[in-house]
Amino acid sequence: MQDNALTIALSKGRIFEETLPLLAAAGIAPTEEPEKSRKLIIGTNHENIRLVIVRATDVPTYVRYGAADFGIAGKDVLIEHGGTGLYRPLDLEIAKCRMMVAVRKGFDYEAASQPGCRLKIATKYPEIAASHFAGKGVHVDIIKLYGSMELAPLVGLSDAIVDLVSTGNTLKANGLEAVEHIVDISSYLVVNKAALKTKYALLEPIIQSFGGAVKAKWAFI
């Protein structure tokens, strides 16, 4: 990467949409909408700043290895896949949700999750799930899925799921209920440590702008 250029790693969807006001606070505007473009590299109103659109789980990897100078990553991704080797200066307080355990309505989770019991857990967060239940002394068989998590308890694939919950509407629509909170999730600014040194003059104003925008947002709530 050039010393006078910045590459920002972002994922499509909610994180991108909620990052736009932060980018605007730093005077950065994408030239295209990722949801409407097939391009994976998108320019901005600054010739030396570009966005790379990657999977949410890949953002820390792009930043850690220097393919991007900084990015926005969910706490769930940082916990599950590791945030080592990254500078994490800000909790941006965006894309907020909760990591929860959910079961079919009527399932006696309290009795089934006593120390020494065994549960089948479907999730795309095996590390988080395993750590949580190990802390409770519960034995688990982890079944890794990549989507439609709510289906697993309904067809007998699992006793419970571990997944992100925002409104809870999807759980309710499928006859499930959240029964245990694991961790609150939001998205963080993650910065490549080498870039922070070599591109400090470019990065620091953006970090400060992001921080100011986060504080201003909560000042009005």
From Swiss-Prot:
PROSITE patterns registered for this protein in UniProt: ATP_P_PHORIBOSYLTR
Source superkingdom: Bacteria
InterPro entries: ATP_PRibTrfase_cat, ATP_PRibTrfase_CS, ATP_PRibTrfase_HisG, ATP_PRibTrfase_HisG_short
CDD domains referenced in this protein's UniProt entry, alphabetically: PBP2_HisGs (cd13595)
Residues spanning the signal sequence: none
GO molecular function terms noted in the UniProt entry: ATP binding; ATP phosphoribosyltransferase activity
EC number: 2.4.2.17
Keywords carried by this UniProt record: Amino-acid biosynthesis, ATP-binding, Cytoplasm, Glycosyltransferase, Histidine biosynthesis, Nucleotide-binding, Transferase
A cellular-component GO term for this protein: cytoplasm
Catalytic activity from the UniProt record: 1-(5-phospho-beta-D-ribosyl)-ATP + diphosphate = 5-phospho-alpha-D-ribose 1-diphosphate + ATP
Coarse class of the protein's main subcellular location: cytoplasm
Subcellular location: Cytoplasm
Pfam family membership, one: HisG
Gene Ontology BP annotations: L-histidine biosynthetic process
Subunit: Heteromultimer composed of HisG and HisZ subunits.
Domain notes: Lacks the C-terminal regulatory region which is replaced by HisZ.
Official protein name in the record: ATP phosphoribosyltransferase
Species the sequence originates in: Neisseria gonorrhoeae (strain ATCC 700825 / FA 1090)
Gene: hisG
